[in-house]
Amino acid sequence: ISRVGLYALPVNPPQLNSLADLGKVPVITHQGSAASEYLKGIGGTVEQASRESLGWAMLQRGRAPLWATSPVVLRSVVASGESPPVEVLPILTLMEDMACNPQMDPEVLDSLRNALKELYEQGDVHALYRQYGVELD
């Protein structure tokens, strides 16, 4: 399970109570992400970044006041000593799965899904999230 929120620099972040308050405020998203597609689908203004680290750089440089990302991504791109962005509004909770070519052999896909399920069941995914300071519960 992954949570995506709208993040802003800690100095004077926009005050949002819901996505209806977003209006045409531009939001930086990772190109092709669920957040990007969701925000575009509700009429949001999206600035797409080709890499997560570019999203952080765009936010720092004022390209847009908000960045749609997850806590795991934040911890991976914000350098030690930098002031991390603050969450303004949570927007999506996603159940994670794998993206695979539609023509992939169904047996191979089932094997990969079973391996992913096993990683969750054995606690490996939780351990990885904890390593980056994120709790799934």
Question: For each predicted feature, which ranges?
Answer:
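Beta->alpha turn/N-cap motifs
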Residues: 9-10, 30-33, 52, 68-77
